[in-house]
């Protein structure tokens, strides 16, 4: 038994020694894949090393991360402001509306009619306005006649010659005014002659009575006549002097009153004439506003159904004139938060809603105008209006140019500058940190 154990131990020793001597000369593939699973860790790694794929994958990911970091620091991206809008004609479509309330007298155009600037589109009934204008013209003519008649009367009073209305046209109205003026002047002359005749009579009688009174004064000193007789003659003289002064005062009053009446009539006539001229201008302007004309060359669109006698309210849109041959542009609405970065001349990229921009491309443009204040749309939202000029008014669709049409929906991407990618990535974090660190 002992012998057998010694032989077994010797045999295992020889095998181990032989294996140790052959340990560096072991051929590849000594163990099959199943056997390697049961080898010690060192022998298992030595027999089947780890694949380098994971190591290279990690290296590639680290290189990509480093490249992305460098690109975010060095690379820049454009800052774009988005504004939705539509295609409009240059100069805008002109909305035609009545500025006065009235009734339709005649419609002179139809939908899609071509019109030139100044063509009459629609007439409103001007009967009431014309009647009012005629009334004021009559009053103005009457006031001018009164003014001319007053000036002629004043000249006649200054010169003593009969008044003549030479400054008015020779028409029945002038003849009637001249006749009325002649009658006025004749009445004045009749009163004046009557007073002057009385003055002349009083002067003659006064001269005679004065001589008699002076004679009685001498006779009284000599004692030939009584004191009473002298006083009677002196009283008669003083009575005639009083009547003479009264007549002269009547003549002066007549002249003053006639002149004052002429001046008052002149002032009133000028005032009435000025008022009538203002009313004539007002009614004439009102009558002209009842005729609606085309402001530009174009095509009539969106004509409201109108018939003769239809009531039209002031500012009610009746039709639209789309300018022809004026080109197109983009009108977009810009949010208030973006207005601080948009300036006239900024480049813009326009995407047309009717055509997929990823397939048919975009249009380049430039900002022409930015409204100085916000405008309010139908939804009571405030926004700024931006006008963009297009470099080309057409897109290449299936090899053919397609012109844009008025009213097409578009989106304008307005380029306002550039920034580094790292700023874009870190700005939300910085903003959040700046806002949150100061909170209570």
UniProtKB/Swiss-Prot annotation:
UniProt xrefs under InterPro entries = MFP (IPR050739), Secretion_HlyD_CS (IPR006144), T1SS_HlyD (IPR010129)
Q: Which residues are listed as membrane-spanning?
A: 56-75
Give me the Gene Ontology terms describing cellular component: plasma membrane
Keyword Transport in annotation? yes
Annotated compartments: Cell inner membrane
> Where, in residue ranges, is this chain on the Cytoplasmic side?
1-55
> Membrane topology per the record?
Single-pass membrane protein
Q: Residue ranges, Periplasmic compartment?
A: 76-440
State where it is primarily located: membrane
**Source domain of life:** Bacteria
- Output one GO BP term: killing of cells of another organism
Q: Which UniProt keywords apply?
A: Cell inner membrane, Cell membrane, Cytolysis, Hemolysis, Membrane, Transmembrane, Transmembrane helix, Transport
PANTHER family in alphabetical order: MEMBRANE FUSION PROTEIN (MFP) FAMILY PROTEIN, MEMBRANE FUSION SUBUNIT OF EMRAB-TOLC MULTIDRUG EFFLUX PUMP
Q: Function, please?
A: CyaD is necessary for transport of calmodulin-sensitive adenylate cyclase-hemolysin (cyclolysin).
Q: Which family is this protein grouped under?
A: Belongs to the membrane fusion protein (MFP) (TC 8.A.1) family.
Protein name (record): Protein CyaD
């Amino acid at each position: 038994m002992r012998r057998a154990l010694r032989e077994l131990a010797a045999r295992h020793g020889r095998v181990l020694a032989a294996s140790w001597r052959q340990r560096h000369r072991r051929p590849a593939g000594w163990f099959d894949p199943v056997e390697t699973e049961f080898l010690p860790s060192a022998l298992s790694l030595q027999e089947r090393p780890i694949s380098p794929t994971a190591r290279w994958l990690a290296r590639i990911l680290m290189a990509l991360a480093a490249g992305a970091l460098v690109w975010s620091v060095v690379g820049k991206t454009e800052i774009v402001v988005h504004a939705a809008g539509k295609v409009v004609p240059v100069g805008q479509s002109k909305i035609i509306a009545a500025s006065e309330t009235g009734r339709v007298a005649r419609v002179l155009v139809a939908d899609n009619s071509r019109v030139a600037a100044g063509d009459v589109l629609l007439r409103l009934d001007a009967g009431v306005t014309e009647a009012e204008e005629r009334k004021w013209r009559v009053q103005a003519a009457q006031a001018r006649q009164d003014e001319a008649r007053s000036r002629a009367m004043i000249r006649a009073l200054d010169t003593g010659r009969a008044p003549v209305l030479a400054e008015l046209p020779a028409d029945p109205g002038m003849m009637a005014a001249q006749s009325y003026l002649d009658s006025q002047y004749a009445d004045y002359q009749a009163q004046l002659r009557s007073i002057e005749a009385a003055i002349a009579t009083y002067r003659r009688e006064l001269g005679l009575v004065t001589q008699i009174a002076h004679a009685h004064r001498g006779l009284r000193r000599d004692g030939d006549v009584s004191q009473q007789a002298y006083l009677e003659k002196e009283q008669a003289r003083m009575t005639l002097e009083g009547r003479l002064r009264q007549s002269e005062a009547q003549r002066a009053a007549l002249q003053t009153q006639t002149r004052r009446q002429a001046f008052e009539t002149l002032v009133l006539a000028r005032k009435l004439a000025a008022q009538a001229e203002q009313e004539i201008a007002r009614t004439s302007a009102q009558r002209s506003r009842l005729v609606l004309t085309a402001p530009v060359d174009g095509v009539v669109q969106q004509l409201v159904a109108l018939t003769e006698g239809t009531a039209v309210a002031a500012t009610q849109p009746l039709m639209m004139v789309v300018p022809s041959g004026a080109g197109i542009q983009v009108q977009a609405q810009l949010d208030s938060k973006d207005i601080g970065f948009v300036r006239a001349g900024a480049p813009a990229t326009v995407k047309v809603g009717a055509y997929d921009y990823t397939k048919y491309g975009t249009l380049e443009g430039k900002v022409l105008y930015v409204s100085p204040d916000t405008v309010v749309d139908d939804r009571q939202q405030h926004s700024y209006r931006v006008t963009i000029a297009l470099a080309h008014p057409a897109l290449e669709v299936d090899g053919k140019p397609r012109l844009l049409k008025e009213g097409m929906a578009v989106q304008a991407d307005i380029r306002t500058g550039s920034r580094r990618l790292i700023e874009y990535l870190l700005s939300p974090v910085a903003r959040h940190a700046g806002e949150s660190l100061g909170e209570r």
